[in-house]
């Protein structure tokens, strides 16, 4: 195992083959938002978004380094191009498309680490896209979920553990 570990840096790196266009990302985003709002309580999502309670479902600034541009994402406004500004998270357009196309996309991204973020903004990232993980596990964000404190506790415990391990 020592040889394998010592030779990691000499191995070829995986590279993204091509960028996903803004138009395609916007389309995937619209499909994603419709799916999320259909499976979950639009009222609760809107309430948390507007009241900013614990910063759930807030607009997030995503820099796509292959586009060399930043975009704001919101569950209600979709994906909007903007002038480059301080991003909450940076990634390749294929990673963002993967989140939009797959309920488990966000979870996969946290495992493969194909994004950059600091601890504070990672928390915001989770609170914006983590709902897909909830849906992938067969649950929905609704008043009924509030009666399941062990699930809520598990979510926050997992968020804390992942954030603690960020560099």
Predicted regions and their residues:
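Feature captures hydrophobic
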Residues: 1-167
């Amino acid at each position: 195992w020592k040889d394998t570990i010592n030779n990691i840096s000499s191995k070829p790196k995986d590279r993204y083959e091509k960028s996903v266009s803004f138009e395609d990302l916007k389309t995937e985003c619209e499909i994603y938002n419709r799916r999320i709002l259909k499976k979950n309580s639009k009222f609760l999502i809107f309430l948390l978004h507007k009241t900013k309670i614990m910063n759930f479902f807030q607009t997030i600034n995503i820099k796509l380094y292959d586009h060399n541009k930043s975009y704001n994402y919101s569950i209600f406004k979709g994906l909007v191009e903007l002038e480059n500004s301080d991003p909450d998270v940076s990634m390749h357009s294929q990673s963002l498309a993967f989140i939009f196309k797959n309920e488990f996309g966000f979870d996969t991204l946290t495992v493969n680490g194909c994004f950059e973020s600091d601890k504070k903004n990672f928390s915001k990232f989770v609170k914006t896209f983590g709902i897909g993980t909830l849906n992938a596990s067969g649950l929905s964000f609704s008043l009924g979920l509030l009666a399941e404190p062990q699930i809520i506790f598990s979510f926050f415990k997992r968020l804390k553990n992942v954030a603690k391990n960020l560099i």
